[in-house]
Curated annotation (Swiss-Prot):
GO terms for cellular component: virus tail. Keywords: Viral genome ejection through host cell envelope, Viral long flexible tail ejection system, Viral penetration into host cytoplasm, Viral tail protein, Virion, Virus entry into host cell. It comes from Lactococcus phage p2. Belongs to the skunalikevirus distal tail protein family. Forms the distal part of the tail. Self-associates as two rings organized back to back, with a central channel allowing DNA ejection. This is Distal tail protein. Its main location: virion. InterPro entries: Dit_C, Dit_N.
């Protein structure tokens, strides 16, 4: 596979429009700089240096842009639609894929030329430049189901057997459930092995008038942040997005959306950066996540 580029108008949304700028009728060529710039604070005296902090910045990306319409009219329309789609959004997302990785960058339009340099059938050959918001990150889809009491989960569940109370022993290799477990929530935790800088989630609450959401624990089991809501009516689902540029906290009941920001437990929401540790569901039957992990250089 050669390098593939796509532009997403709303990567986290259901109305995402995708422009295939590798194989479509609007194409990108010759990126100016997909790398990074590093500024190092170094103190030197007589040739002896002391290394201070390092600041990483992401330079603008410039592409050569060409249209491949079959007529002058179509090429004008392609150019107009593409630029207007980008301008209609606060930012767009560049998908960059090769045989060995797939990463994303959030971009804001900085400059696009219009030199009217026609080619065959009135094709355009221009330059387009983007400012960098976030570059690069991976984007993963994850689904979590809460463990239920009495539910058999192959390879995970265990059974303790015996003939008298207080004399139960674990039977190795048997996949059964923790039937009768009084604290089933303690089994519904998932490991987080790498830092997550933002995520979008769809949460499915169970009980009304009971806090619902997710909480995050550090390596030693202490809660350091949580996104929890308390509503009078149980919501069909809760939509959250912790991206600072696209933040959302919405409850949905049928076709009615409710802003849940006022009913968030702010004392527990201490940071949007998710560290290595564990995640736990609170009063949820299921949760679906799209998570973003930072990768400065690929």
């Amino acid at each position: 596979m050669v390098r593939q580029y796509k532009i997403h108008t709303n990567l986290d949304g259901t109305d995402d429009k995708v422009w295939d700028v590798t194989n479509g009728k609007v194409r990108f060529y010759q990126p100016s700089n997909l790398g990074l710039q590093s500024t190092n604070n170094i103190w030197q005296s007589n040739g002896i240096g002391v290394m201070g902090t390092r600041s990483i910045t992401q330079p603008q990306i410039e592409f050569k842009l060409e249209t491949f319409g079959e007529s002058l009219e179509e090429n004008y329309q392609l150019m107009k639609d593409f630029v207007n789609d980008i301008l209609s959004k606060k930012f767009v997302t560049l998908e960059y894929q090769t045989e060995i990785f797939q990463v994303y960058a959030d971009l804001a339009l900085a400059d696009v030329t219009k030199t009217e340099g026609y080619g065959k059938n009135g094709t355009f050959s221009e330059k387009i430049t983007f400012d960098i918001i976030t570059k690069w990150y991976t984007y993963e889809n994850l689904t979590f189901d809460k463990i239920q009491n009495g539910k058999v989960i192959a390879g995970m569940s265990k059974i303790y057997g015996g003939t008298a109370p207080g004399n139960y022993k674990y039977i190795k290799g048997t996949s059964y459930t923790y039937y009768g477990e009084s604290d089933i929530d303690r089994l519904s935790r998932w490991d987080i092995k790498e830092e997550i800088f933002s995520f979008m989630g769809i949460l499915y609450p169970k009980l009304p008038k009971t806090p619902a959401g997710v909480r995050f624990l550090d390596d030693i089991g202490n809660e350091y942040t949580a996104i929890v809501f308390k509503t009078e009516q149980v919501q069909d689902y809760i939509l959250i997005n912790t991206d600072v540029n696209d933040e959302t906290y919405q409850g949905w009941k049928g076709t009615t959306a409710l802003n849940l920001f006022p009913v968030m437990d702010f004392e527990r929401y201490r940071t949007r950066i998710i560290e290595k540790g564990q995640m736990e569901l609170i009063n949820l039957s299921k949760a679906e996540f799209k998570i973003k992990r930072k990768a400065d250089f690929v």
